[in-house]
């Protein structure tokens, strides 16, 4: 792998008004025909193997091509953009495609894929997925929803996450719940027996029977995690037929109503959104809260190294656990939330089949596991559970079962703006300025006045 400057980098710098570009290149052995593919990737120290695995995949695909007797070989050049986040990166790339330029392949957050599809910049790949089951056949079926637009599939899921409700078993025991009840909570949640309001009831009992200050905590800023609660009440935020943002007043009011009840019953702090992230983590991991609505990566990033929770699987589950996001009503569907980063192929690529095959090879189980275990992400394939490295990273292996029921953010580029409105309304509910119904009305009024093509029901 070597650093080079290319015409692509110069083009991007000119189009985007400056910046820096790092290009990594894979060079094939001499062949009659070299197909050069350029990959756009955000410069992201938290996920360096996303582009690096594509570079590695070139060698694997070239071997496949040689074995097939083909005279074609692929070479990969990676442009790493300096964008601070995936939203900014997607907007920059849309501008580059908009002036008739751009890469052959790109990496993006999944909710942006339909923006590229709508502008004609992303290649539909359904037929290639069906043609090459050796590349795509064992990717978890649920993950394909994250790269689907109204008329087809336009990307390949590169990784996944799991979000859940962590809970403190020690506090539940102190509150009088027996081990049979505590250990059955995950299964009862998945079966639809344990509901969102049951979580409030459990948290309320913990506060009344123990010294814990908090019942349920969630992130203090805008993000995906609390969206799980909205999805439990049936809010999917996208119209399946058109991909437009969808707001359903009754379902929004029901979800905000859960937070409202949590605050009124004293289990969700009214100042949750004013607290520091570290203070919320500390409260949960030091035994001062019953539930923590967050994601699996927090164990390896904070719980184990910072707060000393046991790394051993058996010792961890003796006193800690997690459940999926419960259903709103008994018999309903529990859920989880994941936010995949994805690979995609540009519509203008000259060798679309080779491009898709390359990304298929970049999604090989061993390469994806390299990324998963070094970044605390879930793998995308069932066979990764058999990799000793993945099995050793037991939080990932255990949380993978949630991919069967996982849900996603809406594949709409305006969802980030909508989420900001939802978060503002959530602050209003928790501080007592808005009722659940008023919060729903606020979200709909703000979204319809500031966003485009919002469907309201």
Q: Could you describe each region identified by the protein language model?
A:
Residues 126-139, 181-191, 235-255, 304-315, ...:
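Short, solvent-exposed loop/beta-turn-alpha elements that line the ligand-binding surface or hinge
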Residues 33, 69, 171, 175, ...:
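Extracytoplasmic/periplasmic substrate-recognition and gating elements
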Residues 198-205, 241-277, 321, 325, ...:
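Glycine-centered hinge/linker elements that transmit conformational signals in sensory
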Residues 150-159, 163-165, 191-245, 251, ...:
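Extracytoplasmic/periplasmic solute-binding protein
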Residues 318-327, 372-428, 453-457:
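Long, aromatic- and glycine/proline-rich binding clefts that accommodate carbohydrate-like moieties
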Residues 108-164, 197-198, 317-326, 389, ...:
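Hinge/lid segment of periplasmic solute-binding proteins
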Residues 5, 14-118, 130-133, 175, ...:
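Conserved N-terminal structural module of periplasmic/extracytoplasmic solute-binding proteins
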Residues 95, 103-104, 134-172, 214, ...:
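A structural signal for short loop-to-beta-strand junctions that line the ligand-binding cleft
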């Amino acid at each position: 792998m070597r650093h080079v400057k290319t015409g692509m980098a110069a083009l991007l710098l000119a189009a985007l008004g400056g910046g820096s570009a790092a290009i990594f290149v894979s060079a094939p052995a001499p062949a009659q025909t070299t197909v050069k593919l350029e990959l756009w990737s955000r410069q992201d120290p938290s996920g360096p193997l996303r582009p690096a695995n594509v570079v590695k995949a070139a060698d694997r695909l070239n071997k496949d091509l040689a074995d097939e007797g083909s005279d074609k070989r692929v070479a990969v050049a990676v442009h790493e953009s300096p964008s601070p986040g995936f939203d900014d990166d997607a907007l920059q790339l849309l501008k580059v495609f908009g002036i008739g330029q751009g890469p052959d392949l790109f990496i993006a957050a999944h909710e942006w894929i339909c923006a590229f599809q709508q502008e004609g910049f992303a290649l539909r790949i359904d037929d290639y997925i069906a043609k090459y089951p050796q590349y795509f056949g064992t990717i978890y079926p649920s993950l394909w929803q994250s790269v689907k637009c109204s008329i087809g599939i336009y990307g390949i899921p590169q990784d996944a996450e799991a979000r859940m409700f962590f809970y403190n078993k020690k506090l539940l025991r102190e509150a009088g719940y027996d081990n049979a009840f505590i250990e059955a909570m995950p299964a009862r949640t998945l079966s639809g027996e344990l509901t969102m309001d049951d979580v409030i009831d459990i948290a309320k009992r913990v506060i009344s029977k123990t010294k814990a200050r908090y019942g349920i905590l969630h992130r203090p800023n805008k993000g995906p995690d609390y969206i799980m609660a909205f999805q439990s009440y049936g809010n999917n935020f996208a119209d399946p037929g058109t991909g437009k943002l969808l707001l359903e007043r009754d379902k929004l009011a029901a979800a905000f109503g859960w937070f409202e009840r949590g605050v009124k019953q004293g289990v969700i702090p009214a100042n949750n959104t004013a607290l520091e992230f570290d203070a919320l983590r500390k409260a949960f991991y030091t035994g001062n809260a019953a539930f923590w609505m967050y994601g699996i990566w927090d164990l390896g990033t904070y719980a184990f190294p910072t707060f000393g929770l046991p790394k051993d699987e058996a010792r961890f589950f003796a006193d800690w656990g997690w459940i999926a996001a419960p259903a709103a009503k008994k018999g309903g569907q529990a859920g989880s939330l994941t936010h995949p980063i994805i690979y995609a192929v540009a519509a203008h690529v000259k060798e679309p089949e080779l491009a898709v095959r390359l990304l298929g090879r970049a999604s090989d189980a061993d390469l994806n596991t390299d990324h998963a275990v070094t970044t605390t992400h879930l793998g995308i394939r069932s066979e990764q559970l058999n990799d000793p490295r993945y099995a050793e990273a037991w939080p990932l292996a255990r949380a993978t079962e949630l991919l069967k029921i996982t849900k996603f953010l809406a594949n709409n580029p305006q969802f980030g703006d909508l989420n900001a409105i939802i978060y503002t309304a959530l602050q209003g509910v928790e501080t007592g300025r808005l009722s659940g119904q008023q919060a729903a009305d606020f979200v709909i009024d703000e979204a319809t006045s500031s966003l485009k093509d919002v469907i309201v029901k």
